[in-house]
Amino acid sequence: MKEFNRPTMLMILDGYGINQDTYGNAIAAADKPHLDEIFTKYPGTTLKACGLDVGLPEGQMGNSEVGHLNIGAGRIVYQDLTMITKAIEDGSFFENEALQKAMAHVKENHSALHLLGLLSDGGVHSHISHLFALIDMAKKEGIENLYVHCFLDGRDVPPRCAEKYISQLEDHMKKTGLGKIATVSGRYYAMDRDKRWDRVEKAYNAMACSEGEQAPDGASAVNQAYSRDENDEFVLPTVIENANGSVNNGDAMIMFNFRPDRAREITRAFVDEDFDGFERKKEIKDLCYICMTQYDAEMPNVSLAFPPETMANTLGEYIADQGLTQLRIAETEKYAHVTFFFNGGVEAPNRNEDRILVPSPKVATYDMQPEMSAYEVTEKVLEAIETDKYDLIILNFANADMVGHTGVIEAAKKAIEALDKCVPQIVDSILAKDGQILLTADHGNADVMLDKDGNTVTAHSLNDVPLLHIANEPKQLKDGGRLCDIAPTILKLMHLDIPAEMTGKPLV
C-alpha cells in the first residue's frame, strides 16, 4: 500500500566520475557554480563502480550496461567471465552438472572429449584459464582421450601472438598428462557470426573430417600460416597430423566460449539436425554437446553449463509489487540503460512503470552538440514531477559520458555546463514537493580525458562515482559503498523493506 507520497528520484549523471586531480579533467575545468554548490551543501560519499565491485574482472573499467544492471538489481551482477572464474576458484565448476554430463557420456561410450573455443586471455569471448580448468576436470574424472580444437584470436589480443597461447596449452597438457591439439583455426573461420557458411564449413571439416591444411604440431600450424601471410585471426583451418582428433559418433564436445554471438554458427553445424548452412560431409550421431552459456534460446540438442539467471526483485519490480508508481526517463543514448538494463535485462515495463524517451540529437559526434538533449529531458521531467503521479523517478543525463567519449575536452566542459543549468531546476522542483534525490553516476568518463603523456583518453575511467542525498532534511551517507548499494538505500529512504535478493547494503 502507498504510504510514501513524496517523490523520490534517482538522478544518474552518466560518466560523471570523482577525480581530485584537475589534469585532463573536464568536470573540474567546467564552470558549474550550481553543481559545485549542490556537491558542497548536501551530504555525500563515493561509490566503487568498476572491477570486482560490479562483477567485472579486477581492474576492468565499468560501463553503462553493467552499471545500470548493478544499480537496478541491488546486488553485484557477475558478468559471465567473472562468474565462471569464480566457480573455478570456489570449486563448484568441477561439480557442474552439464560438464559432468559430458564426462560421463565419454566414459560410458569409451569415446573422446573435445574442447573447442577461442585460445587467448582476451576475456571478451573466452579465457584460456577456463580451458585449463576443463582439462584439469577431465583428468580428475578419468578421461583418457581429450582433444583441443584451438580457435586463434588476433583481435582481442595482438594480431600475432598465438604461439604464446599454444605453448601455454601444451605446457598445461604436459603437466596434466592429458590432451592433444587436434586442429587450429583462425576465428575468422570458426567464429563467424554473419552466416558466411563457407568459412564455417572449413572449420567444421577440419574438426569433423580432418580435412584442410596439415601441420605436425600447433606451433608449426601457426608458423606455416604466418609464412602464408595470415595473422592469427585468419589462419586457415589446419589439422594436426597424427593427433587423430576428429569428432566421431558418441563423442562429447564442450565449447568454452562464454560470449554467444560468435559461438552460435559452429555449434549449430554440429548439433542441429535440420542444419542447412552447408552440406555436412559427416554428421555426428550420439554427440553430447555442452555450451558454456546460452548461445541461442532456440539451439537444439545442447546442455548449458551456466544457464542465464533471472533476477527476482530488482528495484523496479519490487517498487511495482508495493503498488507504487515509477517513471524512467532518458534520451535515446541511455534509454535502454534506464529500462532494459535497469530491470535486469527484461524488456517489458513493470506495472505502473511509465517511460519517456527523448530523442538524442542527430549529429555525427556529440562534441558538435554537447548539451545533447539535456534541456528537453529536463523540461519533460519537470512536467512529470508537477503531475504528482510518481513515487520513484529514474533519470539519466547522458552528457558526461557521450561527450567524454569524443575526447574533445572543450566540448565535455560545455556538456557539464549544460548539466549545471538543468540539475538545479530539478532539485528545486523535487524539494518544493518535499521529495528527495539520490544523485549518482554509473561510471567515470569526463573526469579523465588525457593520459599522463597528454594523449586523448576516450574510454571510461576507473574512478569512484558520487552519491549525494539531496533533501530538505538530508541524511548522512556511509562510506565504502558500491553501485549495488544504491537500490537498498533508496528503499530505506522510502521506508520500505529491503528484499532478501538485494545483497547490497543501505548507506543510511
Tell where the protein language model's regions lie, with residue ranges:
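Feature captures the catalytic ectodomains and active-site-proximal regions of enzymes
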Residues: 1-508
